Amino acid sequence: MAILGTEPAFDVTFGAEHAELMKQDSTAVLRLPMPWMAGPMTESLRIAPTSCRWDGDFLLAQSDDHLVGATLVDARGRLEDAVEGAYSRLLELASGWHLYRIWQYVPQINEVRGGLERYRQFNIGRWAAFERRFGRDLRSFMPAASAVGVGGHQVVVVFKAGRIRPEYFENPSQVPAYHYPAEYGPRPPGFARGVVAESGHSRSVLLSGTASIEGHRSVGEGDWELQFRTTMHNIEIMLGRMGCSAALSPSTWAREGIREAHFKCYLRHPEILPLVREWLQALYGTDDHFTY
């Protein structure tokens, strides 16, 4: 979820045949090989850019106050090493900025290779890069984030950073991801549950990927409605803590001073899309602000 303003600088389009990253005039464009089912097909990260340029394998869009970038990483070799290298470079590029949000798309994310799930391999590489950069205090620098599966053979990493130091938020009903026990892998996921960056004239609210988790356990296996209710409860908790409870209800945006809000809903089982849309519309009056 994001609440943003100003002109587009980085467009992310879903439903592509393969991952593609390119510069078009002053806008960076990322096309993702992720199935698109409903809602807006393109998401724009808006920062009123003063430049759009390549820096090695990263395409960057920059304004006075924000830096947005993306890279494609070949994931056919040892995933830990590839991810560590990409994140080390990302953290180098973002030196002098504060990381707000990272979107991560990992091919074959739940496959087991070499005795370890690929998402856990990904976490090892990401953690190693943060640890090398920030040392034992690495948890203080972890942004909001999400990691989901994607087609193709490339890991896609998109980040947003800013000049203003953000406030990091956790969900009191969930264990912080970076404190997950060892049963979830040699290194835990590295992210905050949410981030708010506020200046005198604008406020950005960025929510991490959220699921039906209580504590550190998934709940509602096989029960779609319980999973949905638990997930939305977690989202509502976080939005309340970050001071934007109205973000889910477009009819209240004008009154609450929200210019724009957008959510993405990732479904492992696409056949439940009609149910999810029905539930969201019943709760919030519309689901026009959701991409599926």
Residue ranges of model-derived segments:
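N-terminal presequence-like segments and the immediate start of the first folded domain
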Residues: 1-292
